[in-house]
Regions:
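Short solvent-exposed coil/turn linkers within tandem alpha-helical repeat scaffolds
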Residues: 6, 18-28, 57-63, 91-102
Length: 115
């Protein structure tokens, strides 16, 4: 994680890819952090892949809405408007108490308009 904080994204990807944990929250965060590194490198296809893995590895009220949101934002960048819409809608209905649900209707409307 220190490499990510120091903007050394290649090393962040390298070391986080080797990270293994039985803790599902830590696994989700490490996978999502790889997505963050790829996103910072403007490698959006890879970022999308890792954000999707991160929210699928463990459905929970903490990490799932974070990585659903990040996945949806990158999906918009990639022109995957239906995927973005689905993820934003899932946040609205399944994670309505999350921070990511705040103003989610704006994002849903944007994705819907672009579909």
């Amino acid at each position: 994680m220190i490499y990510l904080k120091k903007n050394d994204y290649q090393n962040a990807i390298k070391y986080l890819s080797n990270f293994k944990s039985n803790d599902i929250m830590l696994s989700s965060i490490s996978i999502g952090s790889i997505g963050d590194a790829f996103s910072e490198l403007n490698q959006y296809e890879e970022a999308y892949e890792f954000y999707t893995k991160a929210h699928e590895v463990s459905e929970n009220n903490y990490t799932t809405p974070i990585y659903l949101f990040k996945s949806a934002i990158v999906a918009l960048e990639l022109g995957k408007f239906s995927s973005a819409y689905d993820n934003f809608t899932k946040i609205k209905y399944e994670y309505s108490e999350s921070l990511q649900a705040k103003n989610i209707d704006v994002y849903i409307s944007k994705a819907e308009a672009l579909k």
